[in-house]
């Protein structure tokens, strides 16, 4: 009888130790990811200004919280997240085509006096497409890091609403000149053919990517909703009922 009690007690101790170790690992992973996001935002801020803080900073911290509450505790079923993630990625790639054709990078350069060129934009787009393919594989195999990168990608898509604000902002470089300009920006990079989409000067309310932005935002919102609904607490509650 004592042997059974001892075994049960030992099993409880091992289970408690295992759960404590798991919680420590999760916390350490979360802290490391949060530090990485803050470090990257700081690095890009020093080189490019406030734009990366808006695009990556806020969404990045939200992604850390979301990932911790959902995917890190229990990876989302690949049957749920992988198709939705790929649909979002496809819509985003179509959205990038409009941005490229509208010279999004030079327009941003003129707006904020930073060194983004069409060439850099294309390189980033190709690298991002490759990264999204790898992330989808990681989601299929339920990898925690893939879950975070997917969360970051989805939340940064919500930052696309800034496209509706940018036409209202006065450009940092020659705001009163309607035609494209070519010059060196604050970082010393030469950027050619920087359009002006300031609505007070052009008379039109548009910014590159505005027409197709819904293709990136709506699937991202739905994916976040489905992942949140599938989080462990909701699943457990539904099973107990």
Q: Predicted segments — roles?
A:
Residues 87-108:
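Transmembrane alpha-helix/helix-exit interface in multi-pass inner-membrane proteins
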Residues 232-241:
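Short, highly charged, low-complexity non-transmembrane loops/tails of multi-pass membrane proteins
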